[in-house]
Structures are given as structure tokens and as C-alpha cells.
């Protein structure tokens, strides 16, 4: 139904008249020093792609790149932060993939579903449309804090 050519937040595959699968992958480098917080932020970011399409997440896979010298406690904290956000979203984490990399990165591949008639697309917005923000972006708060100092 939707692929990369539409620039939407996730790919959508119509399974039948009442169900479409929604799939996304998102990861980035740390924007905070605390590993648990980093896991929470990265997971929320990946999950937001599913929610942006009007879908409900079901399952997620971890994507973790970390220098082995940082130790397993850092990896565990990142993964626990991610798992916490996934559980809060009503989904679960089922494995994933880790690699040794000098530059830390974390994110998720998330699978969800939506009624194909209720998909929210990123095209079609017009000047004058109302935009509801339900939370303040943590990224924006951190940027503001950085600019203040």
C-alpha cells in the first residue's frame, strides 16, 4: 500500500480489507548521557512512527550498536529503557540484533497494525489545519537546555 516513495513514517502492507501491517525501523546516536534514558527516548521515537500512521504497535526488535568496552551494564540499561517504552505502548520486544561499534546507536524495528481505511498519511495537510501536540518533545527540551548554557 505505502512504501518509501510516499515519504510516510512507516511502510504499510494491506493484509485484507480490515487489517494492514505497519512496519518501521528507526535508530540514532545518544542525545543524553544516561543509557536508560537513551533507550527510552530512542524507543519512543521508533514507536512514534507507528502511532503517526494511526496504528497500534505489537512487537519490536532491538537494534543496538555499542563498543564492547562500555560493558554489559550499559547495554542492559539501554535495552531496559527501550523495553519499558515498548511495554507502555502495549507491545513487547522479541530479540533483535547487536553489533560491536565504536559509535553507540540504538533503536527499534516495530511492527504494528491498522485498519487500512484509517491510515494517517503525512500528505494532505493544509495551511490552517489544527495540529494537536500531546507532549513536549524531549529532543526540543534538550536543545533548549543546551542553548541556555
Regions found by a protein language model. Give the residues of each.
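Glycine-rich phosphate/pyrophosphate-binding loop regions near the starts of catalytic domains
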Residues: 1-135
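Conserved small/polar residues in nucleotide/adenosyl-binding loops
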Residues: 139-149
Amino acid at each position: 500500500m505505502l512504501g518509501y516513495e510516499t515519504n510516510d513514517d512507516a511502510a504499510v502492507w494491506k493484509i485484507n480489507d480490515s487489517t494492514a501491517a505497519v512496519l518501521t525501523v528507526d535508530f540514532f546516536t545518544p542525545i543524553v548521557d544516561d543509557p536508560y534514558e537513551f533507550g527510552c527516548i530512542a524507543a519512543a521515537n521508533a514507536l512514534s512512527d507507528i502511532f503517526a500512521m494511526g496504528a497500534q504497535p505489537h512487537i519490536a526488535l532491538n537494534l543496538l550498536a555499542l563498543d564492547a568496552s562500555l560493558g554489559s551494564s550499559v547495554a542492559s540499561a539501554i535495552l531496559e529503557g527501550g523495553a519499558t517504552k515498548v511495554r507502555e505502548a502495549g507491545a513487547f520486544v522479541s530479540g533483535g540484533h547487536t553489533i560491536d561499534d565504536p559509535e553507540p546507536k540504538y533503536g527499534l524495528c516495530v511492527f504494528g497494525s491498522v485498519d487500512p481505511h484509517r491510515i494517517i498519511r503525512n500528505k494532505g495537510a493544509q495551511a490552517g489545519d489544527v495540529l494537536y501536540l500531546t507532549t513536549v518533545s524531549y529532543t526540543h527540551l534538550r536543545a533548549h537546555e543546551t542553548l541556555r548554557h
